[in-house]
Amino acid sequence: MEVAAGAPRSRLLLFVLAATATLAPEATAFQCFCHLCTKDNFTCVTDGLCFVSVTETTDKVIHNSMCIAEIDLIPRDRPFVCAPSSKTGSVTTTYCCNQDHCNKIELPTVGPFPGKPPSGLGPVELAAVIAGPVCFVCISLMLMVYICHNRTVIHHRVPNEEDPSLDRPFISEGTTLKDLIYDMTTSGSGSGLPLLVQRTIARTIVLQESIGKGRFGEVWRGKWRGEEVAVKIFSSREERSWFREAEIYQTVMLRHENILGFIAADNKDNGTWTQLWLVSDYHEHGSLFDYLNRYTVTVEGMIKLALSTASGLAHLHMEIVGTQGKPAIAHRDLKSKNILVKKNGTCCIADLGLAVRHDSATDTIDIAPNHRVGTKRYMAPEVLDDSINMKHFESFKRADIYAMGLVFWEIARRCSIGGIHEDYQLPYYDLVPSDPSVEEMRKVVCEQKLRPNIPNRWQSCEALRVMAKIMRECWYANGAARLTALRIKKTLSQLSQQEGIKM
């Protein structure tokens, strides 16, 4: 394109004008194409610029070609008339030039025009296009909420052919859990069912209902081949607790009538989250805490609850030497909520996630670095004031004894003699808040040296008097002076014989 030779412009201005296609007119006149000039052979003469435009509206396209006089070029270096424009309902594209018939060109259109619906879509189709994505988003959100709400209810499916390691022939039809446990204890290593059998059992359990929640996750009642089981489902962040508890439960020779019967452990990754399952025997009475809240007990019932708890703890604490031996184990979180009541009125100790084992050969204790664990209300004085000897395994056993003395106090309060009994309460209910801190417990137990109150009426009943004596000997500030679990078991066994109680 040419630019007016006589225009007093710098080289920079020439470059800008050329780049923007906004041109000053030639000094002499020239001819342009004019679509309205029918008498002059569609030609006009101007001393300004040739002009061409195309205007698009919602329903038509208008082409326009003509001459623009120099006097109409305002401002002269960037005329408004040569600038493209856009307003509601139309878009105009323009082009100005300064050579003969330079505007005789076809400008491109921008179509389809903005705001105009595609010619192929009617009102119904347009509504479908708009409503479709909206419905999809709504359904997706509802599905996500449903999955999140019911994720723990997802049933384990029967193993399929894509997972041959879980094929059903490993457990024949008609086999019961009792059969499997019997075979394991009589012919196996005594350390639990084979992992393949555990996984097969876990993945064929149908969950029925949630029966409890805790800091680890949730407990469900489930069914395996018609038999009721308890399923403890750990949250994924509690994987260490799940692994530790499964490991402790599978300790050689641990199985005992007063230790919760372990059945299986399994982890299942469904692609979105990991479920960590611990399957055990189901006891419909629930925890000792729940049981004592609901019922009072007779003297016989009190002795059965206490003796079975002591028997379970004595078995945990005891080391069995031999080829199929068992290491000594300390519970470290003994309380009424971690003891279950069986159908026959006896107890079994559960929740071994914080337990520690002692290797007598090397005199080592497998314990996490943080020793301040368990429930603050049941912590022994030496745990509260940090004076416990972490390198001495007996220290952990003695702390368990202190906690068991508090559990006995909870049981004895609910023993009804002549229709008289105390309401259920947690230990130190009258001395500390419902969720006491370590400092609050330390002040009461270590500084003030207070212990739960023993009612005077207990002295009028031999069984309650013996229970009170055992409690006091479990609560000594000096752990070495406390009774052992085996000594307590023997004392309660003698009491049960005196009372004519059959366990």
Curated annotation (Swiss-Prot):
Activity regulation remarks: Kept in an inactive conformation by FKBP1A preventing receptor activation in absence of ligand. CD109 is another inhibitor of the receptor.
Topologically, how does it sit relative to the membrane?
Answer: Single-pass type I membrane protein
| Gene3D superfamilies xref list | CD59, Phosphorylase Kinase, domain 1, Transferase(Phosphotransferase) domain 1
Where in or outside the cell it occurs: the entry states: Cell membrane; Cell junction, Tight junction; Membrane raft; Cell surface
Question: Motif FKBP1A-binding located where?
Answer: 193-194
Q: State the reactions this protein catalyses.
A: L-threonyl-[receptor-protein] + ATP = O-phospho-L-threonyl-[receptor-protein] + ADP + H(+); L-seryl-[receptor-protein] + ATP = O-phospho-L-seryl-[receptor-protein] + ADP + H(+)
Q: What is its main location?
A: membrane
> What are its GO biological-process terms?
activin receptor signaling pathway; apoptotic process; cardiac epithelial to mesenchymal transition; cellular response to growth factor stimulus; endothelial cell activation; heart development; intracellular signal transduction; mesenchymal cell differentiation
Intervals, Extracellular compartment: 30-126
Where in the sequence is Phosphothreonine found? T185, T186
Give any GO molecular function from the UniProt entry: SMAD binding
Modification type Phosphoserine: residues: S165, S187, S189, S191
Q: What Pfam families does UniProt report for this protein, alphabetically?
A: Activin_recp (PF01064), Pkinase (PF00069), TGF_beta_GS (PF08515)
Q: Which family does it belong to?
A: Belongs to the protein kinase superfamily. TKL Ser/Thr protein kinase family. TGFB receptor subfamily.
Describe the task this protein carries out: Transmembrane serine/threonine kinase forming with the TGF-beta type II serine/threonine kinase receptor, TGFBR2, the non-promiscuous receptor for the TGF-beta cytokines TGFB1, TGFB2 and TGFB3. Transduces the TGFB1, TGFB2 and TGFB3 signal from the cell surface to the cytoplasm and is thus regulating a plethora of physiological and pathological processes including cell cycle arrest in epithelial and hematopoietic cells, control of mesenchymal cell proliferation and differentiation, wound healing, extracellular matrix production, immunosuppression and carcinogenesis.
- Subunit text: Homodimer; in the endoplasmic reticulum but also at the cell membrane. Heterohexamer; TGFB1, TGFB2 and TGFB3 homodimeric ligands assemble a functional receptor composed of two TGFBR1 and TGFBR2 heterodimers to form a ligand-receptor heterohexamer. The respective affinity of TGBRB1 and TGFBR2 for the ligands may modulate the kinetics of assembly of the receptor and may explain the different biological activities of TGFB1, TGFB2 and TGFB3.
Q: What is this protein called?
A: TGF-beta receptor type-1
Originating organism: Sus scrofa
Give the gene symbol: TGFBR1
